[in-house]
Amino acid sequence: MGLSFYLLLLCIVSGLVSGVMAMRRKAVLGAAVAMLVGIAGTIGANRLWPLDGFGLIHVFYLAAVVSLPMFLVGGWFGLRRDDRAPRSRWLLPAVATSIVAVGIYATHIEPYRLEIVREQIVSAQISEPVRIVVLSDIQNSSVGDYEYEVMDAIIAEEPDLVLMAGDLWQLPPWEWPQQIHDFEDLLAYLLEGVPGLVMVDGDSDWPDGYDQLVQRVGPRSLFLFDETSETFVGDQRVVIGGAARGEDNSPAERAVLETLVAAPDDALTILLGHRPAVVFRPDASDGIDLVVAGHTHGGQVSVPFFGPPITFSEVPREVAAGGLHEVDGVPIFVTRGVGMERHQAPQLRFNVRPSIGVIDFVPD
């Protein structure tokens, strides 16, 4: 029995307790007892699976979309035959149904509603159009139909180059030998339909795994670990620098930036990193045409008229939410990614659809 099943069962029990007591017109007592059950259960979970911040968020999410609706329905049953109860009691089942619907949508529907985000950048220094597709944060422990649907969507865009901004997988290292073949097949499938793939590492994966994948899928894939690579799209020179996720402003990373800055004036220069904060690196504003990053997942949850409450990034909230922006004079594209945070986190998206980015560079 895993953590997710345990927490779901805990919230069902808590919801039943509070709902039954609310049905008996003891709503306050029921809420108090349910809270005690929840606290005790969370303490028990913490002994079996030491909870991190994502684990606590998971508890609160399930309490909101499972326990609370059961409590509200119980309260409605307790009031529905009481002629003295306010007519507003009929709001209780409506609110409960709405909460459950949001939970189902956020957990089972939106995480798989892939969106294509299109941007165009006009440049006076390039001679030919270049189309780049940005992919990031698949972040799964296994490969399934959804991941292949993402690859089909990328291939359909007919890109000149695909940039992968890290977090290709998220699983314990000891499971990697059993899963590498599936990720190898996934990348090989992608490379059957696109000219090339350039990748950097993220927070949930590791460089050795990328090295293994590149060796297996062939020369049209490339993993950059504080390195640069030069390629051509037709006659258009493209120079890509890959910033490793590790130490910030390391000598190797500074060398990457220096190489990009020193590239010929007619070259298209791109800095690829996992975290958007790579845009703050020294020299990033000195002639780099575009910074590409992932990491934030767009927040995974976005509040209307506010944006994502949590982004785990130093860039402004609107930048972390995804899309093409400018930070300190540097164009940066942050993709919302195609997957979700795993392990202890609640696996959901709300008002933040998964996405791939299609960026067209066109001559002025």
What positions do the PLM features span?
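Non-catalytic terminal accessory segments
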Residues: 1-111
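N-terminal signal-anchor transmembrane helix
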Residues: 81-157
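Short, structured coil/loop segments at alpha-helix boundaries
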Residues: 23-34, 84-88, 122-127, 144, ...
